[in-house]
Amino acid sequence: MNTSSNLVRGFIGAALVLLTLQRSSLADSATWSSNPTSGDWNTAANWVPNVVPNGTSDTATFGSSSLTDVTNTLIIDLDSLVFEPGAPHYAITTLDNIRLYGNGVVNNSEVTQSFVAGAFFFKNNASAGNMTTYSSVGGFFSFENSASAGSAAFDLSSDSTPAYMFFSDSSTAADATINASAGFDVTFLDSSTGGTATINLSSAALVDVPGSFNAEHITINCIGGNQSLGSAVYLEGFSNAGEGTFTAVGGSTIGEHGGYIQVDNQATADHATFIIGGGLGAGLNSGILVFLQTATAANASITANGGVDGSLGGLVVFADKSKGGKASITLNGNSELDISDRNTGVTIGSLAGQGTIYLGSNTLTIGSNNQSTIFSGVIEENGGVNKSGTGTLTLSGANTYTGTTTVSGGVLNVANKSGSATGSAEVKVNTGTVGGSGIIAGATTIGTGSGTGAFLAPAIGTNKQAALTIQSALTFNSDATYTCTFKAKKNKAKADQVIANGVTINGAAVNLVGQTQGSLKRGLRLTLISNTSANPINGTFNNLPDGGIVTINGNNFQASYKGGDGNDLTLTVVP
């Protein structure tokens, strides 16, 4: 015999009997009296007819009345709580539960109606209403089934006891505004949705999402915290950030944590916007966005902003096996992207801004969303960079990473003025293009020898000639093309140029794209490759033999692989 089970059943049975006896005298729809004896909800004389509405099909109606401060101290079940047209402002305080099963709170008045809540339960299709406010310290709110928070405004905080707002089943936050502070916890369960709600978190308040929640167009702002914990959002389980906007604001006082957003388990950032703030003053903490386990940034737009007066910049972290997907990431000011704790490399859609990237020993692949962006910050540590997709990635900073740079699609535009845009290691252009007027430190190989085509084009994407500097050796394989543009008029000419410390050409091609005006002066010379090595160029382009002549716009140019100071590739105007 299960004694514990029988005791529980006995307790529930006794409670139901007591509740039935209570409701036998407190049940029916009624209207709050225009001249009540007190503000006590639970006094029958205050209602017309003289019964307290307390049943799942009952409606409590509030119209014109001489007393509009109302207090409830019992569990109340209602279909609806209705404010009639012309009703004045009511302030209804419930010290126990009000449970709504039908239409919920319906405000037909033209003024805002206020509730001070112990606990509210919205069930079935019940709504929290429009032009309604709910304030609570240590209270409890539950939206179940297909219930809605309507366009209500909630001002919620926690005292010494836990305080929660739950959305479960397929309920929705709708168009509500929820201000939560002091550790209040807003939780979205099951397949609940965010609608177009706005949630403002402060003083260590939380939004917790462990289920299959869809954020839709929600806005959540994490506004700092305290010295032990910042306000936080946890997107977990199979949750979906939808097209929501999530902001983690940096700390505003010494010791205060910034807002924290965590995308975890199998959650997706989908097409959401994330804004991660830096500290708001000298020495202050930043906001943080972290992707963990197998969560994905998907197609999100992520912007991390710099700190004020030297404070920490916003931080974006990919760890475990989390994925960057096609997310666009912008690092402003001294903000940071850290992938050093990833188990392997990570792919992101695009990269822009001026911040710092920590690779660890991983490879950061950039370009899966095919956008064209400029990054002028610093990429550090032992990992590498892979440019993918069809867009252009411009690197204009002096990067210090020590891993390989690979181009597997699109354009890598090197635009730095000092240091090396591609770190210290080798550069491999397997497919796609490398170009620009910047500096590459490592040995550079164009093509694989069996690929679909790889290009070196200093002037790529511009209308003027450029000189690309490679401080190590340059190799062109058989599937490579050197695209060289030039402009010439009479006795003046300007050509693209690659400057390299040693050159090997293994059957590659050169594509000469020239603009000339009239006949050029005999002896006019263009330098296509400036070889800074003491050794001669090894090999020739398959369509430009040594001594060969090419005709461009009626002008003849003769190639020499021993031109310039004796080991450069030059074109000289000849008859």
Each PLM stretch: what is its role?
Residues 2-60, 251, 332-334, 340-343, ...:
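Extracellular/surface-exposed low-complexity segments
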Residues 82, 275-278, 303, 392-394, ...:
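A structural signal for beta-strand register positions
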